[in-house]
């Protein structure tokens, strides 16, 4: 086995090895958290080295257990998977740092279980990122669902259990009824489940492809396209580090990553643009963008507002994939990274506010920015990135998505994306504005001693906010990975 293949497998195995260390150190919080941080650092090192190897032109793949002829556990590194794995590994480190401050500051129980499930989830993310076929993708997709269920129900309350049932029910139902059926249909029709540049279907299989496309889009429930989005707001009962994991690092990104990969490597854009079901799904995704934004405006609970914002932003990426042109794929790939940093910043800030002030409702946060200036400033920066305004990195991904709608002659969708950005302004910017400029009703009351969240959490949210700015000033690495993805998928210049 070559060293590159060993590194590939280690990216999946290192988080699992961390599980053993976390359990062994369960009675010693400092050691337990050191194990988690160390594993995250090792994962970043491995992922970055794989990035360098593939940039030099080396093909890295590994085939393992073969279930049936043509159906094997297969990993293959390509640019979109690298982009996803780099984001996942880096944000695992930052989220672990944040969790140390949050879990201790909030005096959460079962912290060892939390770190164990988190590590298993990250291992699943690496498996999804490097999956070389639909079979491998499906296995790790399901492991990710099951490993995050205990995180959603972490509090152990009836509300948490109900949220967990909705979470598990929707994600397992969609994946088994639709996604698994789509994979079987692909294998039967095309004779393969491997991801291939240009897709696996030919023109004679257009009808079958048109039937299978909705099964994939609805079956990948983690992409949260309406009406299969309810699991996402239901999961907001989880601790904030879990919400950050769900919305930025792992679960939803696994969803839209899978949608983008299926559209490019299973259908191919030449065929995708000809399918009658593509048009329907494209406008359904556009409707999800607007409807979720409107629902977000009505939420007073901060995490609920951010949850519906996530539903809307994920549909941007689905729109990019279904537009079936290179600008859409480029914008969708870049938005995976841009949204990750913007949204994780917002959730980190929401958690910091809850730990420091015990406030969860936006209407109670007037004047809070004067006592938590770093947190509220970070929230402002994250908001700009989600909206798509400088100096937020989301500016660039939304730019390419707008270009894609023009190139595809979908002016209605261009208006939808513009209207959504205006709605983003309406439901995000008033929060820091009121936090800094409105009078603080508790300035002389019982809450006058409220200050910033614990230092580890404050460092984490500051780093992700800085990341939003860095991705605006220096988007080249993300852009280059996205363009390499276009080349690998045979889309460059399309």
Give the role of each language-model region.
Residues 1-7, 19-116, 191-200, 483-492:
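Transmembrane helix-loop-helix hairpins at membrane boundaries of multipass inner-membrane proteins
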Residues 11-12, 210, 223, 471-472:
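Hydrophobic alpha-helical transmembrane segments of integral membrane proteins
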Residues 29-40, 162-172, 244, 371-376, ...:
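Alpha-helical transmembrane segments and their helix-start/interface "positive-inside/aromatic belt" motifs
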Residues 37-51, 173-182, 382, 463-477:
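Hydrophobic alpha-helical membrane-insertion segments
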Residues 89, 251, 397, 460-462:
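Core segments of transmembrane alpha-helices
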Residues 94-112, 118-137, 147-399, 403-434:
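Hydrophobic transmembrane alpha-helices and their helix-loop junctions in integral membrane proteins
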Residues 142:
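Short phosphate-coordinating micro-motif centered on Lys-Gly-acidic
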Residues 370-376, 429-494:
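Cytoplasmic/organellar membrane-interface segments at the starts of transmembrane helices
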